[in-house]
Amino acid sequence: MAQRFRIWPQFRAVAIALTLGFALGTAALPALADETRTPHGDIAGTLRAGGIDAGLARLVSDLDAPGIAVAVVGPDGIVAEQRAGDLAGAPPTALRWGSLSKGITGSRVDALIASGDLRLADMLGAHVPDLPAGYSEITIRQLLTHTSGLSHDVALTDVDRPDTSAREVVPELPVHTPAVPHGSAYEYSSLNYLLLQAVVESVTGEPFGPPTGVPAHGCSLETENGSVPFFGMLMPAGQRCDAAGLGYGYFGGTFDELTDWAAWNLSARGRIFHAHSRAAATPTAADAPASDTRREAMYGFGWNYDTVDAGGRTWKRIHHSGAVPGAFTRIEILPDDNRAVVLMASAYGEPGSADLPESTQFLSSLLAGGQPVPDSGSAEGVGAPVYPIALGALSVLTAGAGVSLLLQVHGRPRRPVTALAVSATGSAAMLAGLILGIPAVTGLSVVQLGRWAPDIAVLAVASTALTVVSAFAALIRWGRIPAQPANASATSSRVRTRAGAASSGSDS
């Protein structure tokens, strides 16, 4: 009975650690479930009963972001809109537009092609000097359509360099060894559009900017930070701007300016641009060769092209999303309907938030007369379910690492060598996961993950640190345990028994 009480503090520590880990991993799940649920609700019925304004108001209410704005846009501007939170006040809030910047770059390149300064078949090396090996034979078309063979490596993009041109960054790029021949397969990579920005800078001899009449701004624009998810709550996102990355993700502006850009794409000028873009587009399906232009899903000059069935007919659709930590944008265009849906939100992080693009798709389908998609309770894509699962798993892992450390400090392992081996193996596995596993799965380093999903990054670092410290504690304890002969324990027990008997005899 006495020994049971001696080891009770260890079990109490274990229980406390597991309880904290369980609470940490599950406290945020109700909020996360709300975030990853498709917010369709009764939007379809509201829109049909009360019109576009009522439907937009319901959508904005259901999305429940710190700042959100959604609009239906025609060639002449906004037809209907609803704004809430940070995006409803004055003066207007400006945010970075993320990858919607690619369409602006595409229109800039298309204008240079129309003027004869560029050709789709031109090789990168003909316009940009100081290229590292492997880049010079990539064509302008391959860059525009993501068929260059370049991989999506955010270690080379999304850097805070507000005063640096793309031309200055190009010589610092790593040597490129394509896994497949240039032009043979689609692989989305923002690096393509950084290189296109360098092409425009070289051809024009001027700093990179949007085409005339397009209201987008570079790093001189002051933007709001926005928010990223943090254990079911929100925390401010870090502020940064990549002037070498305006072409792929760092143009910005207000919601009004974003709707103006959507209207530009419905104008006569925009329709000419999209005719060029669609004609040069490449299939995005992994199993489709780049030469197969019969596929519906295509990528052109910074835009996705496909079709959607709604109202008993098939509609052409042009769309793209944009995201930086703390901000999300999306434009969805139905050119045959002469309307577009535009959405901006001042909160975004990865993984998760898939309800934002899905809601825009849902709304555009309704406007075209389509039937609402049944609400399955989960958002489109892998981000939404992965986020709470990863958060819960890492919380339990962190608690387990804490338990291991407590046992090393306070416990009395009978097999110290085994405890040391287990701790060392766990430590090595956690370090490998932190250094190699996270980048392999997410494409982000731990530091970069901290911008998109700080709660995941915090738990990953904490669990690894606790495991490593536990291994060191096991090593220290193992080094302090003196070697004993096999019968040492029995001898010690007999000595204590005799000493106890002698003591009893002297007291009587």
Predicted feature residues:
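Short, conserved catalytic-motif segment at the N-terminal edge
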Residues: 44-98, 114, 118, 122
